[in-house]
Regions:
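A sequence/structural signal for flexible, mid-protein segments enriched
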Residues: 1-168
């Protein structure tokens, strides 16, 4: 038997990163651990969707997508937008005591902002909702959506803006 699967994805226009920087909070108890800030300006057309990822050079084998990495412009269309991001570790990485979730002075980080189409955003959103609700007996059941007809998974075209941040 022949199984046919079909998928399509629209390559959206690139939305460049305006700035990315490493920030140690004023309330920090460790002067070498901080957060990553990224900003961009959303185009004035409603319906843009994004995904964010990061990779520590020489430490992470690939870009890491944290939970909550996908969003759209329904809450801020056509305006500058800045957000702070914690560091997610790669699978099975042991974190030193007190350093989980923080970037560290001396890290060189590639920050990537991806413009994705609405179908990809919707599929990713159902996946993230399902993963974040695991083990919660009060969470409603979630069916993870796919944008592949006749199959499971995602077919995603993305335009990416990448910035390099030196954590100093």
């Amino acid at each position: 038997d022949t199984i046919e699967v079909n998928a399509s994805s629209k390559l959206e226009n690139l939305v460049p990163i305006d700035t990315s920087y490493f920030q140690i909070p004023a309330t920090a108890t460790n002067d070498s651990l901080g957060l990553m800030a990224t900003s961009y300006t959303d185009p004035d057309t409603l319906g843009n969707s994004y995904r964010w990822s990061s990779r520590r050079v020489s430490k992470d084998p690939s870009f890491i997508y944290p939970l909550g990495s996908a969003w759209d412009d329904s809450f801020g269309n056509g305006v500058p937008f800045e957000f702070l991001a914690f560091r997610y570790s790669s699978d099975f990485e042991a974190e030193p005591e007190g350093e989980a979730g923080f970037w560290k002075s001396g890290d060189t980080v590639l920050v990537r902002l991806e413009s994705i189409d609405k179908a990809a955003y919707s599929a990713l959103l159902t996946f993230e909702a399902s993963v974040s609700a695991q083990g919660n007996p009060f969470a409603p059941p979630t069916n993870v959506a796919s944008n592949i007809e006749g199959g499971l998974g995602w077919w995603i075209a993305y335009s990416a803006s990448v910035d390099t941040v030196f954590c100093n």
